[in-house]
Amino acid sequence: MSSSNALDALIQALRRLPGVGVKSAQRMAFHLLQHDRAGGQALAQALHDALGSVQHCARCHTFTEAETCRTCLDPGRDATRLCVVETPADQAALERTGAFKGLYFVLMGRLSPLDGVGPKEIGLQKLIARATEGGVQEVILATNFHAEGEATAHVISQALKRQGLHVTRLARGVPVGSELEYVDLGTIAHALVDRR
């Protein structure tokens, strides 16, 4: 605790960010106050603006300032392919590859019964409605490869297949440029089973 209530409040606010503990929050707060007050003002203004204007896209659920995001409005996208991701960060990672030219649906999470996150909370019914509104020929599940991501993919796959949709899952395997001796056994096992 410092001698300033405002400084303590700033440190506590910074601790709300993922991966930021007390020491990191203190370093950030001290840096902004001591060396970069203009940067602190810019950060505060950008945060204020984003909180006031960023919302969910009506079609894909990602973040946007408009009712419908630029990706969903882009006539150059392949509307026959719909890729389901957990977060906008996952969507951004796929976009950076330049390999996917279809559309997205962002779950804004993954199934986690222990945390009270079920099919309703990840928008399963919205996804089903989006995938069945016409034109979608393939739904690609790009949830993360851990227990919750796999469970999420399974539940979504079953629900979409009941609607008669073609559902695929991202392949998993050995990373490009890696050496087998350094790859974990689970990855090697999946690569062997899913070989083509």
Swiss-Prot record:
GO terms for biological process: DNA recombination; DNA repair. A zinc finger (C4-type) spans 57-72. SUPFAM superfamilies: Recombination protein RecR. Pfam families: RecR_C, RecR_HhH, RecR_ZnF, Toprim_4. Keywords: DNA damage, DNA recombination, DNA repair, Metal-binding, Zinc, Zinc-finger. It comes from the Bacteria. One of its GO terms (molecular function) is zinc ion binding. InterPro entries: DNA_Rcmb_RecR, Rcmb_RecR, Rcmb_RecR_Znf, TOPRIM_dom, TOPRIM_RecR. CDD domains: TOPRIM_recR. Residues 80-175 form the Toprim domain. HAMAP family: RecR (MF_00017). May play a role in DNA repair. It seems to be involved in an RecBC-independent recombinational process of DNA repair. It may act with RecF and RecO. Belongs to the RecR family. This is Recombination protein RecR. It comes from Verminephrobacter eiseniae (strain EF01-2).
